[in-house]
Design a protein with these regions (language model features):
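Glycine/Thr-rich phosphate-binding loops of Rossmann-like dinucleotide-binding domains
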Residues: 83, 130, 172
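Paired acidic/hydrophobic, glycine-rich loop segments that form the ligand-binding mouth/hinge
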Residues: 55, 69-76, 160-165
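A conserved helix-loop-strand patch within extracytoplasmic ligand-binding domains
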Residues: 77-78, 86-138
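Short, well-ordered beta-strand segments
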Residues: 5-7, 73, 91, 121, ...
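Ordered, amphipathic secondary-structure segments that act as subunit-interaction surfaces
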Residues: 68, 72-84, 198, 208-211
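Short, structured active-site "lid" loops
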Residues: 47-72
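Small-molecule-sensing regulatory modules
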Residues: 2-38, 43-46, 50-52, 133, ...
């Protein structure tokens, strides 16, 4: 078999995620090559993500596959649009890494230990709104850049604390010893519900490619079910990766899920949770509809 060409962004974390896919393919005796792609998010790092539109981490990477420059695209699934572009489909997801958000600080052990007036960095609307909801006395400053850049800004004293995905830290630490031993405080999902599909690496390719069956071998079924349930719930409300919504499903047993979904806008927080049974699309739809009803009852309109 020819080498599999893998398209992805060129950031340190993205290269690590490609490496995780490559290792699985190499175990099957398949060689790979890397195709680096610059995305809109890479080119406009000074701009807030909310101003760049949707799909800023994935469009150009997917286009490389559509153009025949690569065989597959590897993404952090939380950055993907809710609908896969025409001609492409989700081939597989790797086993989920921790889905939670974490706070990293050199001086403080958690959000509620930060002194009034301290500066906390994040580029996520969901995280910003959560900080304002719980700690209006903190200064929230936009934080763009790859995860290693964000950590460097923290260590250089530009921020007193930052909030990032736990998965990004664990992946960095696994493949680069300089990131081992970073202490962080993990958020319980009832306090800060993660973004949909956080901690999941997705593999996307052409719908008509014969490679599709090969990548099915890499698919983690439990993670796939959780991913579909979360995306379904998000689609019910119409939110994207820049919306103030968090959702997390855990498949407890085949067809049984624990789910939680939260809307938070800095002034109001609405959370629904429970145990659900059925296929991923069904349980995701149920949770999404429950939250949507409560949002509408409060007279809140979410921008899509």
């Amino acid at each position: 078999m020819k080498k599999i060409r893998i398209a992805a962004r060129g950031s340190k974390l993205s290269r690590i995620q490609v490496r995780m896919v490559e290792e699985k393919l190499n175990k099957l005796g398949i060689e790979t090559s890397f195709v680096e792609v610059k995305t809109k998010a890479d080119l406009f790092q000074a701009s807030p993500l909310s101003q760049l539109g949707k799909g800023v981490f994935e469009k150009e990477v997917n286009q490389a596959v559509i153009n025949g420059e690569a065989d597959i695209a590897v993404h952090s699934m939380k950055d993907m649009l809710s609908e896969t572009p025409p001609g492409l489909e989700l081939y597989a997801v790797l086993k989920r890494d921790p889905p939670f958000d974490v706070l990293i600080s050199l001086s403080y052990r958690g959000l509620f230990e930060l002194e009034s007036g301290k500066v906390i960095g994040t580029s996520s609307m969901r995280r910003k709104n959560s900080i304002v909801f719980y700690r209006k006395d903190l200064l929230v400053r936009d934080l763009r850049g790859n995860i290693d850049t964000r950590l460097r800004k923290l260590f250089q004293g530009e921020y007193d604390a930052i909030i990032v995905a736990e998965a990004s830290i664990t992946r960095l630490a696994t493949y680069d010893h300089q990131y081992q031993g970073i202490n962080y405080s993990k958020f319980d999902p009832t306090l800060l519900t993660p973004e949909a599909n956080q901690g999941i690496i997705a593999i996307v390719g052409k719908s008509n490619s014969p490679l599709k069956d090969l990548f099915r071998k890499l698919n983690d079924e439990k993670t796939y079910h959780e991913a579909i349930a979360e995306r379904t719930a998000l689609n019910i409300i119409g939110g994207g990766c820049h919306s103030p919504l968090g959702v997390l499903f855990e498949e407890l047993d085949e067809g049984e899920y624990r789910g939680i979904m939260t809307f938070i806008d800095g002034k109001k927080k609405i959370t629904v949770e429970g145990i659900f049974r059925g296929k991923p699309e069904k349980v995701g739809g149920e949770l999404g509809k429950r939250l949507l009803k409560e949002i509408k009852d409060e007279g809140i309109v979410i921008e899509t």
